[in-house]
Swiss-Prot record:
Regions of this protein lying in the Cytoplasmic compartment: 1-82, 134-153
Residue span of region Disordered: 194-214
GO cellular component, one term: plasma membrane
Subcellular location: Cell membrane
Identification of the protein by name: CASP-like protein 0U1
Native species: Ostreococcus tauri
Spans traversing the lipid bilayer: 83-103, 113-133, 154-174
Origin superkingdom: Eukaryota
Subunit structure: Homodimer and heterodimers.
Extracellular face of the membrane: 104-112, 175-214
Mode of membrane association: Multi-pass membrane protein
Keywords of this entry: Cell membrane, Membrane, Transmembrane, Transmembrane helix
Amino acid sequence: MATSEAPLLKRTAATLSDDMAVNYKLLHSPKFRALVVENVLSVTAFAFMARQTESLAGPEMETLNNCGVNGCGFTSFYQFKGVVGVYAAFWVYTVLLIGLYLFSRGPPPGTEFVVHALFTLCMIAFVSLSVISCTSTVIESDYSVCKNAAYAKASLVFAALVVVLNCATCAFVFKQWRSLQFVGMPENFRPFGRHRHKHGHHAGDADDAIPTHP
């Protein structure tokens, strides 16, 4: 009984070991390295903005007075709070994604592209609004909201770098998804999907069948 169980235990342990093995080859992938850089830049972006608890001028003179002599913090501006929220959420996402990739459990290209694209759109929106707010002048023509807010200005620089890297990552993931014939996307939404259907494409054709899962 014991002798028959020993090989089974060894096979089970070997299977678990293979499943939990770290994919070290992935460390040399440009896509993985870009993801790590995005992770570092995103945590830097929201950390700097979150540290801006004073020195911001209000969009109106009354706001400046209400914040006192030390000025406003980032919480007085929904744009800056949006930067903190979006980039903090993206940092958590990149941490999870890095962990999945290390153990060869990455999401399908379609899922990764959609999530990255949505994050990028939110980033572009809040960064653009923050830059507009940051450069707005109050009281005097040469006194901007972020004139004395070094952390906020640094945060927006790092945030913009993340947007650039995200756009490059989206392009790379989209190419991967396209090479898999947009697997997971409904037929009617695929490029040329309706055209192929009109010309006699059948789901039962083995040569033309598109898998629904990677």
